[in-house]
Amino acid sequence: MTTLRTPVLQTTGFPSRAGRAGAALPPRLAALAAVALSLAATGVGRAQMAGAAAPSPDPRVGLRAGWMNAAEASWNLKLVSTTPPPAQFMNGNEPGDFNFINSDLAFTGKYVVQGNFSGIQIWDISQPAHPVLAGSLVCPGAQNDVSVYRNLLFVSVEANSGRLDCGTQGVHDSVSADRMRGVRILDITDVAHPRVVANVQTCRGSHTHTLVTSPSDTADVFIYVSGSAPVRSPSELAGCSGLRPDQDPKSEQFRIEVIRVPLAHPEQAQVVTKPAILSGLAHAETHPEAPEDIAAAARVADSARAKGAFVVKVFGLDQVAGPQFTGRMLDSMVKLRGGTGAPTAADSAMLRDSLQPMVDRMFNGPTLPGGVRPGPVQCHDITAYPAIGLAGGACAGYGLVLDIRDPANPRRVAAVADPNFSYWHSATFSNDGRKILFTDEWGGGLQPRCRSFDRKEWGADALFTLADTTLTFQSYYKMPAPQTANENCVAHNGSLVPVPGRDIMAQGWYQGGISVFDWTDPAHPREIAFFDRGPMDSTKLEGAGSWSAYWYNGHIVSSEIARGLDILDLQPSALLSQNEIDAARLVHVDQLNVQDQQRIVWPAAFVVARAYCDQLERGNGLAAARLRAVRSALASAERQSGRRRQDSLTRLATQLDGDASSAADQARVKLLAWEVRELAGATH
């Protein structure tokens, strides 16, 4: 039996919740928070999930492989449409071509913007069963992650091949005035013809970015840039420094970059600060690779070593250095000694001696004076929640909480490390801001990490409660169906599904498909729906699967790495009622950037009250006879109008106040009473 290791918490200067601008919870959310606390204390959340078993055997196991014709399995989730990528964004002759990976999603009006390592696609999804390509731009520069704000589109560019002119020929010089690494800003007023208005260069490029809105600044938006590439040469971008901070106080290490975008003049966007949010963190130990992977890598390495190949260890795994890389290194050694012609045996011996230390420096980061290994030097992704003045930073070896009340100067206020986490990847807050979920992208997203022997706490989600100065670990969640060695699978991007009274999330797991799960009780998360396909290839791993699965105005939209765009609908079940789905569909937003998390607010509606009734029934939170009477009273009031409806609802709310004291789920009955009272107030 293995023992779970407890995450280690570091906290610095966390502001009280009352002290954060905009942090006070509206009455309805305060009631929701009380529900969450009640669930954790009483176990009512587990009762909500009781008696609704997932299908057995799991239909996701053993699915037929295929590119566009793989077998599919689903439970409580219906595939509405799959739209293949247009020709310019796929290689029809090479499945899994890394140059044409579909990446993240952003939403505006009837459009979803889908990033692709070769550019952007803008889909009209007003008819979810038949999406239409409304606009596109071929512009290589992986990952091309996207965000939108009004008529502006923001795109992350990190690849060395990215060009200012969006050319497809790449950039081959080590230093070039043509290279673009940073954040592109496009005007998409005419979605059919996206137009670049600014290229904001950054020292490490932009692997991901976070669009941050500020309640106190409506003239600007801010972009938090997370760059994971090596620091650029100052000969290419002035001011860039890859030295240790003790060698150069302006080092790019341990920082993010903040871009201010004046909305009236986006062409004037520029980097305004470089907060060192990672400074002072110690190196965080993580788990080794799976024993099966270590043994398999050693066998491959032994065979390659016997043939004269160069072998190094990367994160504990033997890796064979590619001939292109070693060839360049050997040529450099010939030039270093002033020689010409082919490398000699002495050159090869020198490379063997120097290669492992070189790789260690590349992957382990800088070593500080005294041989101290610091924590991570960059973040992978940040999720901002402006309404509560906080952001969650997923920063390789740590999960962070940031104070973003001054959006140009985010400040770390808490950090947590977990030896079960390999690579902190992304974050999601609960709607009330009192819980936070971090994902672990163990294996980097291109490895199979959901096999039957992979530990359930590795490559999973970690769920925490968040109370002022304290992050408290609760549990892990991992998509439960074992996948094959030919399917890249690990926790990736997802968003909340706006079901009132519950914390539900839809999440992409690459070739593990889409998993929808309830984490209202963070100590006991539970899958309630899924969709999955078989592997791309039954004989080898070809990268594919759901990069992101996001709820948007009634549907779950998924960016499928190799197969295009999926749109899915939740189906009613014992774990999620039609009333709950309909209540979620009441929430409509004009734009959505999941990493700029916005507070979910439900309108006063009878279906919201009925959703709470369904939850009370599922969890045995109110006596059955009393619940029947409440439903009857709601139905009667809905048929009424004017003063009669108002009086009926006010009377019912008062009765529910009295019911709460003896109910098994007091907090949810109070929430229902609040909703009924809101309905009375909305009646004219």
Located regions from the model:
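Intrinsically disordered, low-complexity segments enriched in proline/serine/threonine
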Residues: 9, 17-18, 28-29, 133, ...
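Bacterial N-terminal signal peptides
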Residues: 19-20, 26-41, 46
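Feature marking well-ordered beta-strand scaffolds used for ligand recognition
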Residues: 48-615, 629
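Soluble extracellular-acting proteins and domains
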Residues: 579-684
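N-terminal secretory signal peptides that target proteins for export/translocation
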Residues: 1-25
